[in-house]
Swiss-Prot record:
Function: An essential GTPase which binds GTP, GDP and possibly (p)ppGpp with moderate affinity, with high nucleotide exchange rates and a fairly low GTP hydrolysis rate. Plays a role in control of the cell cycle, stress response, ribosome biogenesis and in those bacteria that undergo differentiation, in morphogenesis control.
Lineage: Bacteria, Pseudomonadati, Pseudomonadota, Betaproteobacteria, Burkholderiales
Quaternary structure (record): Monomer.
Chain ranges of the Obg domain: 1-159
Family designation: Belongs to the TRAFAC class OBG-HflX-like GTPase superfamily. OBG GTPase family.
Name of protein: GTPase Obg
Entry's localization field: Cytoplasm
GO biological process: ribosome biogenesis
Amino acid sequence: MKFIDEARIEVIAGDGGDGSASMRREKFVPFGGPDGGDGGRGGSVYVIADRNINTLIDYRYAKKHMARNGENGRGSDCYGKGGDDITLRMPVGTVINDMDTGELIADLTEHDQKVLVAKGGAGGLGNLHFKSSTNRAPRQKTDGKPGERRMLKLELKVLADVGLLGMPNAGKSTFISSVSNAKPKIADYPFTTLAPNLGVVRVGPGKSFVIADIPGLIEGAAEGAGLGHQFLRHLQRTGLLLHLVDLAPFDERVDPVAEARAIVGELRKYDESLYEKPRWLVLNKLDMVPEDERRARVADFIERFGWTGPVFEISALTGQGCEGLVYAIHDYLVEHSDAHRAELAEDLASDVRFRDAPGAGGEPHERDAGAH
């Protein structure tokens, strides 16, 4: 199914039914008094989060969603039937905003979370309500109220603990397939990844985290170049960013330091809060660098890049250094997360959008040195 992470829809709640101005008419009861019933309430529009859905594609084409109107009241004190509510199912992680006011209506972060987005109109009152000691035969009644009508902007932001950054062909998809059971498309050409890939990484019983790979960024992404700018929003919920760098590009004219600086620049231009997130440097494809050159090449990169944070040396293809990185990530998340992060990871592990997998060889990852 095609991945769609943004849509605009109109939701229209039902109008309330009108009240009835009816008089009781029965044989031998010439002055029966008022018996007009109330109108039924209009149907409301709700959204509910469903972890079995992973795209907003249903709302890319079905743009108008209407609930039924309430029925009018009738005589003999008959109340109108209320309009049926409608429920729109959306992926967990969907953010809903009112397009006219900019109001944040809902942030669907939990499975089965239900939110009212358009309230049905109240039913009108029948003339029975207007009877008094001085007005025994009232003719007044009220009309039903109109239901709410809203234009909504839907944005899907995936729920992940860790996000991967990097140029196209930095090895992000290979890395996520190496440490989890996600199966992204992998090839030796740019923009192989066209939509976010997610995987649950298990490091032991009850120890897991969710990792997200988005399409690679290129210079100018913040202004719309390439593909990655469309998906940077998916990194906004993460607690840690991994900046993957190809330390052995096929094209010798490519400078990894210049590419790394471009990524950081695009991140800052797109969202300052993303730039401020904790970020680790992961130097990938070291299996392509001769052993006697590795230390010097790593040191040269770190010096020219001016990096002072955590650095990991890995080969996503062979798995070298990946286990140590996985354990370091888990330890960091446990130390810096709130109390319910582990519970959230377990909930996400059961989500069909995420592939739950043990470590390499079917066993939990064993610790491996790799951080500087």
